[in-house]
Amino acid sequence: MINGTVRIRLDLAYDGTDFHGWARQGDSDLRTVQKIIEDTLTLVLQRPIDLTVAGRTDAGVHATGQVAHFDVDPAALETRSIAGDPARLIRRLARLMPDDVRIHNMSFVPAEFDARFSALRRHYVYRVTTHPRGALPTRARDTAHWPRSVDISAMQAAADALIGMHDFAAFCKYREGASTIRDLQEFTWHDVSTPQEPQLYEAHVTADAFCWSMVRSLVGACLVVGEGKRADGFTEHLLGETKRSSSIPVAAACGLSLVGVDYPSDDQLGARAEQARAYRTHDELPSL
């Protein structure tokens, strides 16, 4: 219990195509994922609901493994139609929410759980095709098109140079007061072509956290290396930059999906949240 409330975790998915991103835009009527879910929860529970999310996805970005949490007076869950059961609440919400958002699980979690700060790492997948005709019609909403052919080996070499804890300022849009030091744990390129979907690639990207537009910038940097526009060593050189680099294209939002978020065991939730809230400095970077 937190000041007489209980904490509930949501596991959810959405097609980001028709949303202006995750975050509610103040009092604006812009359609965002947060606004849709908060407004629906508020309607059903008859309490104001504020969501905290693991990853604030941009406009057009999708999620299959997004995580959020909210706190609520347990009395709000005791109506006849819910009876204290989160599964019943999911069913109530499903009847009211649009088809491009789905909550697939709800559960009570400890007060120490924080969807954002307790997360150990976030996993993203980026789908892109270089086929002249673009993506299959059935995958056009979650697959980006790159207009030139690429060398996947060159892209993987560019990705490998970025693994580890670095200052990714060159890959991040500026946000006042935000650190750009991140621990990039996985960045692998895969040729997932099929006869129906030739020239199709996926980038699997994992880090403890990502700054604003970082994943799409990482992908864009590799794509320009893969097409031969930038030379070997391009991405490694960018790690020395101290501000956003204009030489990096930001890959299209439609190809990106947040596919998972990892959390520690319950007894480690508070410690992880405290660690994640600490502002990282260059003193923490490994010696070269």
Curated annotation (Swiss-Prot):
Keywords: Isomerase, tRNA processing
Gene name for this UniProt entry: truA
SUPFAM superfamilies the UniProt entry points to: Pseudouridine synthase (SSF55120)
Protein name per Swiss-Prot or TrEMBL: tRNA pseudouridine synthase A
Molecular function in Gene Ontology: RNA binding; tRNA pseudouridine(38-40) synthase activity
InterPro entries reported in the protein's UniProt record: PsdUridine_synth_cat_dom_sf, PsdUridine_synth_TruA, PsdUridine_synth_TruA_a/b_dom, PsdUridine_synth_TruA_C, TruA/RsuA/RluB/E/F_N
Active site (catalytic residues): 58
Biological-process GO terms, alphabetical: tRNA pseudouridine synthesis
Function: Formation of pseudouridine at positions 38, 39 and 40 in the anticodon stem and loop of transfer RNAs.
Disulfide bond entries: none
Entry's family note: Belongs to the tRNA pseudouridine synthase TruA family.
Lineage summary: Bacteria, Bacillati, Actinomycetota, Actinomycetes, Mycobacteriales
Residues engaged in binding substrate: 124
Species of the source: Corynebacterium diphtheriae (strain ATCC 700971 / NCTC 13129 / Biotype gravis)
EC numbers, comma separated: 5.4.99.12
Catalytic activity annotation: uridine(38/39/40) in tRNA = pseudouridine(38/39/40) in tRNA
Subunit structure: Homodimer.
Highest taxon of source: Bacteria
